[in-house]
Amino acid sequence: MDTLAALLPNLSASVQMVVFVSFMVAFAIKAPMVPVHTWLPDTAAVARPGTSVLLVGVLDKIGTFGMITMCLQLTPGASASAKWAMCVLAVISILWGGLSANGQNDIMRLVSYTSVSHFGFMVLGIF
């Protein structure tokens, strides 16, 4: 990690942006952000309750942790350039998760969609 942190700031802005987008796509899938959040409600609805608690309560936090440790620290220039786009995606996640949760009858799907909304707040705070 230290080697990457030393090399990436010296690279061109376009290369930094490619690295940033690559990491962000991976971490946005893990931390369910719109538009790549669709795996969470379906997975939590069919999983056992204990597994759903781990999915929604613990494992999804890895995505936001990765955003902080990898995206912000390794590519600070690209992170600064993309902050408005990330904030827009975060607000869309907040609204989409909240509105989608209102129409759910299954408790685990409801929790999953509120989790999408909560992760939108986390990403908004990060950027």
Each PLM stretch: what is its role?
Residues 1-127:
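Hydrophobic transmembrane alpha-helices and their helix-loop junctions in integral membrane proteins
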